[in-house]
């Protein structure tokens, strides 16, 4: 599953949406920004094996929490990633938090920086922890 999503995301998405031009222009571009529905379903199905193991050890609540957390993360990722690619003048695009996170994501779209800086699309926390936030002068 990962190679399919990577092959679609890296060459297409990063070629079309560049650092200073990340806004979608047409609703048909949703396919370039969002994970395909089958990808979401595959992610959900991949959570079921660990959940089944947890369930087998009488940890049903933990199993449900695991699936809910994984899917919550994926849906949050999708919503935030979409919001970064909406026009900056849209209602969502004007939200302060979205604006700040869009700037962080724009560095990820710079071809000279994307392999080294700003990997986390949803929340820069792990970029901060791992030291992969791009220096301010970039």
Would you name each region that the model predicts?
Residues 1-63, 71-78, 82-138:
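Membrane-embedded catalytic scaffold of the fatty acid hydroxylase/desaturase
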């Amino acid at each position: 599953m990962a190679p399919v999503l990577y092959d679609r995301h890296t060459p297409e998405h990063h070629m079309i949406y560049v650092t200073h031009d990340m806004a979608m222009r047409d609703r048909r571009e949703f396919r370039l920004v969002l994970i395909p529905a089958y990808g979401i379903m595959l992610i959900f199905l991949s959570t079921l094996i660990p959940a089944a193991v947890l369930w087998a050890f009488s940890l049903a609540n933990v199993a449900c929490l695991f699936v809910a957390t994984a899917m919550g993360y994926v849906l949050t990722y999708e919503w935030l990633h979409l919001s970064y690619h909406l026009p900056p003048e849209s209602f969502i695009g004007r939200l302060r938090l979205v604006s700040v996170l869009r700037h962080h994501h724009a560095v990820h779209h710079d071809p000279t920086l994307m392999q080294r800086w700003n990997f986390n699309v949803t929340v820069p926390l792990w970029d901060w922890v791992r030291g992969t936030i791009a220096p301010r002068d970039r």
